[in-house]
Amino acid sequence: MKASTLVVIFIVIFITISSFSIHDVQASGVEKREQKDCLKKLKLCKENKDCCSKSCKRRGTNIEKRCR
């Protein structure tokens, strides 16, 4: 009985660690997307610090704002 409990604990720990590593990979993908989107003419507009020029307007149906 003790051996099966240890195996179950090991499996739960393994699944937890693997889910954290998958989450980190997805987060790095989001960071890469943000870097790609921040091109010279299509920089994302920040509310506090506008990375664009003063003409920051909505583009498309997305909530995020981009420069023209």
UniProtKB/Swiss-Prot annotation:
The keyword Disulfide bond applies. The record marks R66, R68 as: Essential for stimulation of [3H]ryanodine binding to RYR1. PROSITE patterns: SCORPION_CALCINE. GO terms for molecular function: calcium channel inhibitor activity; toxin activity. It is found in: Secreted. GO terms for cellular component: extracellular region. Belongs to the scorpion calcin family. This is Urocalcin. It comes from Urodacus yaschenkoi.
